[in-house]
């Protein structure tokens, strides 16, 4: 049987329950899912690459048990299609929260298909309970001392609280 490999790219700064929702759905589509953390030299993320790897690994293990081992965390810079090819992925996962996401992601999928016709983009709609969550809003709420526990895994909530307590 051919192993289906997918790549789900993002900054994951921080990992949210919305990201976990997409990762869970991805496990139904692929045997192995790479959570690919985009590294952009011009951006200063709140969490380092190493911290984001650890948070993703901790959260997926806690949330998915043994299935969490099917999620691998990697870094990439440059084009996501190159990251997918490097990992041997034939599927690129994209989460959709709303129509705005769909419009943008359809444009990206079209461009990616032109450059890499062997890769299939799969859109996964977010569950209603996580559709409003964005990492940007989570960071803003955390920076103002708000309760971010409904929006992120427990390990991420602790790490965010510690970051902003300094």
Swiss-Prot record:
Key word Nucleotide-binding present: yes
Keywords assigned: ATP-binding, Coenzyme A biosynthesis, Cytoplasm, Magnesium, Nucleotide-binding, Nucleotidyltransferase, Transferase
Main enzyme class: transferase
Catalytic activity: (R)-4'-phosphopantetheine + ATP + H(+) = 3'-dephospho-CoA + diphosphate
Binding site for ATP: 11-12, 19, 95-97, 105, 130-136
GO MF assignments: ATP binding; pantetheine-phosphate adenylyltransferase activity
Pathway: Cofactor biosynthesis; coenzyme A biosynthesis; CoA from (R)-pantothenate: step 4/5
InterPro entries: Cyt_trans-like, PPAT, Rossmann-like_a/b/a_fold
Cofactors demanded by this protein: Mg(2+)
Binding site for substrate: 11, 43, 80, 94
Signal peptide span: none
Compartments in which it is found: Cytoplasm
GO cellular component: cytoplasm
Keyword flag Cytoplasm: yes
Residue numbers marked as site, Transition state stabilizer: 19
GO biological process: coenzyme A biosynthetic process
EC number: 2.7.7.3
Main location: cytoplasm
CDD domains reported in the protein's UniProt record: PPAT
Oligomeric and partner information: Homohexamer.
Stated family: Belongs to the bacterial CoaD family.
Purpose of the protein: Reversibly transfers an adenylyl group from ATP to 4'-phosphopantetheine, yielding dephospho-CoA (dPCoA) and pyrophosphate.
NCBIfam families referenced in this protein's UniProt entry, alphabetically: coaD_prev_kdtB, cyt_tran_rel
Protein name: Phosphopantetheine adenylyltransferase
């Amino acid at each position: 049987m051919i192993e289906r490999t997918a790549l789900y790219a993002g900054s994951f700064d921080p990992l949210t329950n919305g990201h976990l929702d997409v990762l869970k759905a991805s496990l139904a589509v692929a045997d192995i899912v790479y959570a690919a953390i985009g590294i952009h030299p011009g951006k200063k993320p709140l969490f380092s690459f190493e911290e984001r790897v650890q948070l993703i690994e901790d959260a997926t293990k806690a949330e998915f048990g043994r299935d969490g081992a099917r999620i691998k965390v990697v870094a990439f810079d440059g084009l996501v299609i190159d990251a997918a090819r490097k990992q041997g992925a034939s599927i690129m996962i994209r989460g959709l929260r709303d129509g705005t996401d769909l419009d943008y992601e359809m444009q990206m999928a079209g461009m990616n298909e032109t450059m890499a016709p062997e890769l299939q983009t799969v859109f996964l709609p977010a569950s209603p309970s996580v559709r409003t969550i964005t990492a940007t809003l989570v960071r803003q709420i955390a920076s103002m001392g708000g309760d971010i526990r409904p929006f992120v895994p427990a390990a991420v909530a602790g790490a965010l609280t510690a970051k902003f307590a300094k």
